[in-house]
Amino acid sequence: MGRDKKNTALLDIARDIGGDEAVEVVKALEKKGEATDEELAELTGVRVNTVRKILYALYDAKLATFRRVRDDETGWYYYYWRIDTKRLPEVIRTRKLQELEKLKQMLQEETSETYYHCGTPGHPKLTFDEAFEYGFQCPICGEILYEYDNSKIIEELKKRIEELEIELGLRSPPKEEKPKKATRRKKSRSGKKKK
């Protein structure tokens, strides 16, 4: 995995973990190499408690490590944090597998149920049983519920599942069909073309 790809993946995971504040903490930690939570808070302007939460989440995700140093004068321990990308490919794979399972569950739900909707964006999509309970009227606006065409959602889910399975090596990429070569008819000895 190249340096830029690694950095982008790390920042994406940081954003998932703690939003823009986590991205700032990771950037500061990468730039500094090793720092305490207080130093990171000062560098980023993020509250110390938030920095600690982010660091612990990165540690739980196996993307940060620390070393503990005891101050002989005060007896206090200081934690020096650093980013650890050795396990980044493993973390990315695990996250993709989790996403794949979630997408498969969503596909199962979309294909096993018939849904009903009033057509108003933001209003709930209801299963047959739920729609029946409401007398096939939207619980928000009271409009009639119609069968919901989820074929586009199903196709998008199948496409993303296939992409993830290919990325994870669980499925071979589809083979591209080669264009067929035009065949020439052979001429017979008499000069006429054979069929």
From Swiss-Prot:
Presence of the UniProt keyword DNA-binding in the record: yes
Q: Where is this region: Disordered?
A: 172-195
Instruction: Give start-end of the signal peptide.
Output: none
Keyword tags: DNA-binding, Transcription, Transcription regulation
Q: Name one GO molecular function term.
A: DNA binding
Report the domain of life of the source organism. Archaea
An example of a Pfam family matching this protein is TFIIE_alpha
Q: Which InterPro entries match?
A: TF_E_archaea (IPR016481), TFE (IPR039997), TFIIE/TFIIEa_HTH (IPR017919), TFIIE_asu (IPR002853), TFIIEa/SarR/Rpc3_HTH_dom (IPR024550), WH-like_DNA-bd_sf (IPR036388), WH_DNA-bd_sf (IPR036390)
Subunit structure comment from the entry: Monomer. Interaction with RNA polymerase subunits RpoF and RpoE is necessary for Tfe stimulatory transcription activity. Able to interact with RNA polymerase in the absence of Tbp or DNA promoter. Interacts both with the preinitiation and elongation complexes.
* PANTHER family per the UniProt record, alphabetical: GENERAL TRANSCRIPTION FACTOR IIE SUBUNIT 1, TRANSCRIPTION INITIATION FACTOR IIE, ALPHA SUBUNIT
Q: Which family does it belong to?
A: Belongs to the TFE family.
Q: What is known of its domains?
A: The winged helix domain is involved in binding to DNA in the preinitiation complex.
Role of this protein: Transcription factor that plays a role in the activation of archaeal genes transcribed by RNA polymerase. Facilitates transcription initiation by enhancing TATA-box recognition by TATA-box-binding protein (Tbp), and transcription factor B (Tfb) and RNA polymerase recruitment. Not absolutely required for transcription in vitro, but particularly important in cases where Tbp or Tfb function is not optimal. It dynamically alters the nucleic acid-binding properties of RNA polymerases by stabilizing the initiation complex and destabilizing elongation complexes.
Q: What is this protein called?
A: Transcription factor E
